[in-house]
Amino acid sequence: MTTVISKKRLIITLSIFLAISLSCQTPNKKTESSSKEVSIKILGTIQDGGMPHLGCSKKCCINYYSKGFPKKRVVSLGISNTKYNKHYLIEASPDINYQLKDLLEDNNPSKSLDGIFLTHAHMGHYSGLLNLGRESFNSASVPLFVMPKMGEFISSNGPWDQLVKLKNVELNNIFNEKEEALEENLSIIPLLVPHRDEY
């Protein structure tokens, strides 16, 4: 499904997407929204723990084991700016390997991943960063856009601090309601929303 969206609508769409927590009720098909220059791709919709969720006794989890449904991925969003050939990931989920392949159509994020935005420190939103470390991909200075509190958490706690020390990621602070211009036709405005906030 393809629709034309304005910059304002993109901001609203991102805000809504980032504020929603989904459980077993998920869409069955990939959804993509695009304009001529900027497209948004939903790369995952499942809650932090994946599918089936550990300890889940809901029908959807039980059916997953017994019927072998196709893999559903943890929440993530991809943004592509075709005018500048730039690609951004919202969240670094445990499924980051597959999600980057879906977004970039390549399994090498250093070739064309221009940044990762993290919304908060729940495991399904940042645990995929581990794949950027030296035990796996050993990336080079992938821009990581975070609120100051999240940046402090990453730079002060292992194993995340190693990503910063080894320059696998490069921290970039973003601020509530302050526009982050990525290109002349694309910017993101982070919005704080009520949500559990352990870190």
Give residue spans per PLM region:
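Bacterial N-terminal signal peptides that target proteins for export
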Residues: T2-I12
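C-terminal motif of bacterial Sec signal peptides marking the signal peptidase cleavage site
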Residues: I20-S23
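Binuclear metal-dependent hydrolase catalytic cores
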Residues: T26-Y199
